[in-house]
Structure formats: structure tokens, C-alpha cells
């Protein structure tokens, strides 16, 4: 296992280590002679590794879930049978009253195991503001997230995704300090269960890449990280932060990545985000984990939007493998 850019990497780096060890050992044995045919066979497992993996965020099906045309428990099977993916990112809104329902959580876990689908994280909303200026409300928000961390642990997730919201009317630094105080308490709780607490750019100052990266530096904990979203860079009103700059600033702390999509052209390219440019930023940061499809557009059906996003990501993956 190798650490690069603060991220543990197993694939390409470990193959390099294997290659170096092989060359060293064989050089010792045969006086430095090169045996490429032996090396090629020995290292065959190191080639054609995917640059990243693809998962599905439950929000991609939010309209179907809200209309009850599909049930939250069906999300896992759909991910595998309809979209051919093997990892999911849950949204707490779709099982909001089930965080402590052991029977329900066990059913989720059983279905994931039956379909060979990994549960990666739970996106947590509607649990108060972790940077609330009122200390009682801030502490309550921290405690509100405990049950989701416990559920994530049971489901074998690696993280909960939270929001670093404060009072938008407060100064930049004050919001940073308040968010850091609330998040630090939550991070310390989650750390006891080996669960990461990751923050998404999700409105307000969290959509300012410099602010959110500063928040990570202030918290300075290995269990605190980011979930860079390709599209969520609207701070307020019409104040947009540059998405490419923002993702680049957040990638050093990334423990997950959200490939937001809305609309595709006739060539299969996303209209709002240059996926090739964005994924280069992601890969250049040394990230090789899951990239989560999060389609939320209206131009295509949810199913079509997911398939289009998946097709584009797979195309980019093939070009970088």
C-alpha cells in the first residue's frame, strides 16, 4: 500500500513496486541480464487496470423515489441489473426514519451482499447546520448525525457525507470557525467507528473551493475529507465559483467524487461540464477510487441520464487505463 497525495493507492503504485522488486531480484540472480519474456508474464496482472471505479448515487433516481415508482430497497438491485454497476451511495432522505431500524438496515445489507454491491457512503441532509452560530443547535446537529454514522458502520460504508452550512449572513472567517467546531466534534465521534466524515460542495460557502479546502486544513484530521461535486458551485444567487478550480482545490482531501450531470449532446458529452477536463483534474490528484454518477437533469429520463453518464465515464476510463 502506497500513499500519494494523501490517498492510499493499491493499483498502479503496487505494480511499480512489484516491477522494481522483480528487476532487483532477477538482476541479482542472472548478473543483470534482462529477461523481458519472464517479466511480461510475471507482471501481466499489472496492465490494463481501470483508472477509477464507477458507482451510482441514489439522488440520480430522486424523482422515481419521491413518486414511489421505485422503493429505496430496490435501489441496490437496479444498480446492478439495470445499470451494471457494483457500488452505491445512499441518500438518507429516502430512508430517513430507518436509521435505527435494525431490521430494515439488515435487509439493505442482505440485498447488497446478495447482488454483490458495495455500500460506499450515506449522504446526510436535513439534520441541522453543523456550523450553526447557536451552540445548542450546532451541538444538536452534530448529535443528529450520530445515528447515520452508526448506520454507515453497520452497512459497511466508509463515510457519511455531511454539509458544512452556517449562517450565510456571517463573515467568511466566522462561518469557517463555526463549521470547523461542529465538524471536528462529529469527526471525532465517527473516528471511533473508523468512519470518515466528508463534506460536499453543496451551497453557501461550501461551494467556494478555497473556503472548503481551508476548512479541511483547519480540522486537519485523517478522517475528515471532501466529496468534490462537478456541478455544485453556486454559492448564492448568481455567484458561481469556477468548477474546475473548485474541484482542483478539493481533490487533495477527496475520499469520494461526485460526477454531477444534467444534459448530454448528440456526441454523448455533458453540456455543462467538460468531463475530460474534469476527470483529468481528478486523476492528476492521484485519485483512483469510485466516481459516483449523480444525474439530476430534466432533458433525459433518469434511467437515460444515468446510462449516458456511465457511458461517458467508461469511455474516459478506457482512455486512461
Regions found by a protein language model. Give the residues of each.
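Glycine-rich, proline-tolerant flexible connector loops at the mouths of alpha/beta enzymes
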Residues: 89-108, 167-170
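Short acidic/polar active-site loop segments enriched in Thr and Asp
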Residues: 86, 118, 158, 288-289
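Short catalytic-loop micro-motif centered on adjacent basic/acidic residues
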Residues: 89-90, 197-201, 266
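Conserved beta-strand positions in the central sheet of alpha/beta enzyme cores
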Residues: 87-89, 121, 161, 258, ...
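Charged helix-capping and loop-helix junction motifs
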Residues: 70-74, 103-107, 138, 142-145, ...
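Secretory targeting signals
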Residues: 1-17
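Active-site acidic/histidine proton-transfer and metal-coordination neighborhood
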Residues: 26-39, 77, 111-228, 235, ...
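Histidine-acidic metal/acid-base catalytic patches
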Residues: 11, 18-37, 41-84, 206-321
Amino acid at each position: 500500500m502506497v500513499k500519494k497525495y494523501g490517498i492510499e493507492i493499491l493499483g498502479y503504485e503496487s505494480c511499480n513496486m512489484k516491477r522494481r522488486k522483480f528487476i532487483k531480484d532477477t538482476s541479482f540472480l542472472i548478473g543483470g541480464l534482462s529477461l523481458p519474456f519472464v517479466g511480461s508474464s510475471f507482471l501481466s496482472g499489472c496492465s490494463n487496470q481501470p483508472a477509477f471505479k464507477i458507482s451510482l448515487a441514489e439522488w440520480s433516481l430522486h424523482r422515481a423515489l419521491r413518486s414511489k415508482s421505485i422503493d429505496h430497497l430496490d435501489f441496490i438491485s437496479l444498480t446492478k441489473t439495470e445499470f451494471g454497476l457494483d457500488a452505491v451511495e445512499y441518500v438518507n432522505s429516502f430512508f430517513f426514519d430507518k436509521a435505527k431500524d435494525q431490521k430494515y438496515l439488515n435487509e439493505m445489507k442482505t440485498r447488497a451482499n446478495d447482488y454483490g454491491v458495495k455500500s460506499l457512503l450515506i449522504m446526510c441532509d436535513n439534520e441541522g447546520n453543523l456550523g450553526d452560530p447557536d451552540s445548542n443547535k450546532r451541538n444538536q446537529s452534530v448529535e443528529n448525525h450520530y445515528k447515520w454514522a452508526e448506520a454507515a458502520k453497520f452497512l459497511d460504508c466508509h463515510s457519511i457525507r455531511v454539509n458544512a452550512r452556517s449562517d450565510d449572513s456571517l463573515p467568511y472567517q466566522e462561518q469557517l470557525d463555526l463549521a470547523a467546531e461542529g465538524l471536528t466534534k462529529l469527526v471525532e465521534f465517527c473516528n471511533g467507528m473508523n468512519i470518515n466524515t466528508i463534506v460536499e460542495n453543496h451551497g453557501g460557502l461550501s461551494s467556494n473551493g478555497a473556503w472548503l479546502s481551508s476548512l479541511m486544513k483547519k480540522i486537519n484530521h485523517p478522517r475528515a475529507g471532501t466529496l468534490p461535486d462537478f456541478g455544485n458551485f453556486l454559492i448564492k444567487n448568481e455567484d458561481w465559483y469556477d468548477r474546475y478550480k473548485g474541484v482542483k482545490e478539493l481533490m487533495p482531501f477527496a475520499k469520494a467524487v461526485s460526477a454531477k450531470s444534467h444534459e448530454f449532446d448528440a456526441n454523448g458529452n455533458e453540456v455543462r461540464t467538460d468531463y475530460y477536463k474534469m476527470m483529468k483534474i481528478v486523476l492528476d490528484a492521484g485519485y483512483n477510487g469510485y466516481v459516483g454518477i449523480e444525474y439530476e437533469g430534466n432533458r433525459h429520463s433518469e434511467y437515460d441520464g444515468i446510462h449516458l453518464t456511465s457511458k461517458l465515464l467508461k469511455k474516459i476510463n478506457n482512455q486512461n487505463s
